[in-house]
């Protein structure tokens, strides 16, 4: 997002979200987190505008007690929206029903002084016995960590789809992956299934892919969709990979909701003073 138009787009973006969203984004210490939060809000608003045909300023959101966003105005819609940010990316997913969740992870291979096995052992309480076995049996450090991030994305995605958020025991969520599938960039996988407390959960579809060479993502949605839904039925045409967008897309047909003094110059300078994570 940092191009020659970044300053203009940033100053427009912080004024194109409600005041409370702007203020929340400004609270973050790092630039990365501020941008990610801002982009998440723009994704939700831009998608809702396109799905409903409503004007930018007419759209209103609320959040559940666990923090999951949902559309309030215009009313009468039941589609789901979700965002996630980690590493260098913010991702967005939607579905025809309200139950949809997405998660993204950067494939960080540096773990301080820990080997992959040591790192996995330190996180063992979040994994089932089956998941731990699959992680530990991988032949290389990189493959072990890639599978760890894969499982983590899946767990986050289903918890966001259900709206549960953080749970005490992630090991109850036991994902079964098809070892015959190639988990690599360019592939789109939907074969993964879920057991919760050893009971199969047929309700969910998990869509897994690499956003780019350094980031993996998982989307969770309900399997049974209405016939009016664009994704109704199973076919290769429904394999929707993530596409990268820019500020121009996110701000299309936007308007000012949060006018700032100096057209946002002070806020932009404040942003520049913040450190980057990496």
Task: Name each model-derived stretch.
Residues 1-278:
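Core catalytic alpha/beta fold that binds nucleotide/phospho-ligands
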């Amino acid at each position: 997002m940092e191009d020659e138009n970044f300053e203009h787009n940033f100053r427009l973006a912080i004024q194109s979200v409600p005041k409370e969203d702007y203020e929340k984004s400004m609270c973050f210490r790092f630039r990365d987190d501020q941008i990610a939060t801002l982009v998440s809000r723009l994704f939700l608003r831009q998608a809702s505008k396109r799905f409903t045909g409503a004007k930018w300023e007419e759209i209103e959101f609320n959040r559940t007690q666990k923090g999951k966003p949902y559309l309030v105005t215009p009313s009468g819609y039941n589609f789901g929206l979700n965002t996630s940010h980690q590493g260098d990316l913010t991702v967005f997913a939607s579905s025809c029903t309200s139950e949809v969740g997405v998660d993204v992870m950067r494939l960080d291979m540096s773990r301080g002084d820990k080997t992959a096995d040591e790192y996995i052992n330190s996180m063992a309480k979040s994994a089932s016995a089956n998941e731990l076995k699959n992680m530990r049996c991988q032949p290389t450090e990189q493959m072990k960590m890639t599978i760890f991030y894969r499982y983590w994305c899946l767990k986050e995605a289903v918890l966001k789809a259900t709206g549960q958020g953080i749970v005490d025991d992630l090991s109850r969520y036991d994902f079964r992956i098809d070892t015959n599938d190639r988990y690599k960039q360019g592939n789109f996988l939907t074969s993964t299934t879920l057991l919760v407390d050893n009971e199969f959960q047929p309700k969910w579809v998990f869509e897994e892919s690499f956003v780019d060479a350094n980031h993996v993502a998982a989307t969770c949605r309900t399997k049974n969709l209405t016939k009016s839904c664009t994704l109704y039925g199973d076919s290769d045409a429904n394999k929707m990979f993530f596409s990268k967008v820019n500020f121009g897309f996110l701000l299309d047909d936007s308007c000012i909701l949060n006018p700032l003094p100096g057209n946002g110059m002070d806020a932009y300078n404040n942003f520049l003073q913040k450190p980057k994570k990496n």
